[in-house]
């Protein structure tokens, strides 16, 4: 009886239409054992929404303004609305954790995120985002502190370093650092060979553009692995889980890769062509590319398509790479 749990073989990322500046994608992973779609989908969703690192404005100083309930001469919106609009600006910092930026604008018209003066290692993802509007003769002089953080941090929880008191005119903002806007998931049915009781996990992820959905799901998976690693070895250092016996870990292959290609039930012509190239196991086959197979004598496009279809039915594709293949003791006929 088969006791090994299935691992997802097919991963597909499909970009979806989204609001301007946002990134949205559908990520599909299959197959999972029954129930694992909900188990992993819910865990990934919670991590994506709560634990992604991002950048947000945290403090603002405006010339002539003492507090957030002030009005600014020549500015159509009050300070509260200006702060709300400022939170909609998406920043990305490279090789730094915080920066203070300057925004100076005069004259009638809209003030946009692109008007903020930025150094070379600070990027504004949505430069057309409107922060406020100036009337004729209006002027805005603002300093914006942008920091790196995680999740949501209310302004009441923020401190001012070693300063004994708050500086007059410095406005502290509630900071939403998360670059992930929305996450949803569904679990559909999947099939592998004769098994139809498997799960397919479909996740829709929307970000603000500071990171892509693919980067977000990779980061969330890494967080989960690091958090769960402690349960894999209840004694010793967490790093030992990843560092100990790397050779042993790397030789654990999915059992399907150790099966002979004869079990794929290919046509006699295709099977003979593979054996002529010393391809005896499914693990040998998936490491070949389409180009390499087409160079095989007597193996044409029709045979190649047959091989690809048979592999796809088992959740496999060509062009893979397996470290430490073949495993020790595997019979090369």
UniProtKB/Swiss-Prot annotation:
GO terms for biological process: DNA-templated transcription. SMART domains: RPOLD (SM00662). GO terms for molecular function: DNA binding; DNA-directed RNA polymerase activity; protein dimerization activity. Its EC number is 2.7.7.6. HAMAP family: RNApol_bact_RpoA. The N-terminal domain is essential for RNAP assembly and basal transcription, whereas the C-terminal domain is involved in interaction with transcriptional regulators and with upstream promoter elements. Belongs to the RNA polymerase alpha chain family. This is DNA-directed RNA polymerase subunit alpha. It comes from Methylibium petroleiphilum (strain ATCC BAA-1232 / LMG 22953 / PM1).
